[in-house]
Amino acid sequence: VTITFVTIRTLDAPLAGFALSFALELSDHISWLLSKYAKLELDANAAERIVEYTQLDQEPQSGIPVPVYWPSNGEIEVTDLCVSYGPDLPPVLSDLTFTLRPGERVGIVGRTGAGKSSLSLALLRCLDARSGSIHIDGIDIAQVRLHDLRSRVGIIPQDPVVFAGTVREVLDPFGQHDDSELLDALTEVGLLRSEDGASGPFSLDATIIEGGRNLSQGQKQLLCLARALVSRPKILIMDEATASIDMESDIRIQRTLRQVVRGCTLLVIAHRLSTIADFDRIIVLDGGRVVEMGTPGELMTIEKGVFRGLVQESGESVVIQQMIHGNTIEL
């Protein structure tokens, strides 16, 4: 079309109309070509990811057998732990050493990038130790079969995993528990009330869409907490589970942790410091190392301490200090 207008000095009306009609069609073809090229790029990225997944090393399935009741106490002993995301990458956790006593409630705090979530991954062997060890009830988890370890340690991640199906199937996918246990768990986390009956939104036969798209973020977290309560693990890890939920759901989770979760070792990686202000101990991470450890009251007495600084910057300083000093906030 451009060549036609440039080479022909005098252009009558019919020829001009003919050229313009082709110009309109050309723009449609160019638009179609660009959209196909963009789709090709997306497909190429998807194919590249699939190839990467096929080349990943499979996790080892071997390991020593453990007693059926393991862990029976919930003691966690971390010794000189060093962890990285790859053999050629710098460590994200270095020389970590601490012991969690059975039934103890411990909060893990620190600034972004301190290594808090990496610790939870190491406890489940999603990241293998470069050096050092983690023992649960005296057994080195590096020697335990992954299925045994991950099926017996409860975890509630920041991004909850909810499958499609009924509430019953989400709470008990293998059908190992009675309906009464499932109903008790839903009631304990506040998702089910006595007046809801069998037709409530969280009755056992209620439908959950894939990914929990028919639930709020807070409801998904509460459902995951109920699932953990059903299995009654001796160790429960919460990885910033209240970071992105509404205040009402946060209050329900805190009430459950304080009034219902008993007899298990509770490890909470905290986004809101009020979540762990009245816990037995606090472990403060910075740069992948333990920089402070003790009761909340002890850490608040450290001048220019990391935990004290986090409390002062939190915007909830008054509430947190009231909880630390025993003035329980009504939930």
Can you say where each PLM-predicted feature lies in the sequence?
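Primarily ABC-family ATPase nucleotide-binding module
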Residues: 39, 51-104, 111, 128, ...
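ABC-fold ATPase nucleotide-binding domain signature/coupling loops
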Residues: 99, 129, 135-140, 189-223, ...
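ABC ATPase nucleotide-binding domain helical subdomain, centered on the C-loop/LSGGQ "ABC signature"
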Residues: 48, 52, 135, 143, ...
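Cytosolic ends of transmembrane helices, especially the final helix of ABC transmembrane type-1 domains
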Residues: 25-54
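C-terminal portion of ABC ATPase nucleotide-binding domains
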Residues: 180-183, 188, 197-202, 255, ...
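Catalytic Walker B motif of ABC-type/P-loop ATPase nucleotide-binding domains
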Residues: 236-240
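A short, proline-enriched helix->beta-strand linker immediately N-terminal to the Walker B motif
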Residues: 230-234, 263
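Helix-to-loop junction immediately C-terminal to a conserved catalytic motif
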Residues: 123-125
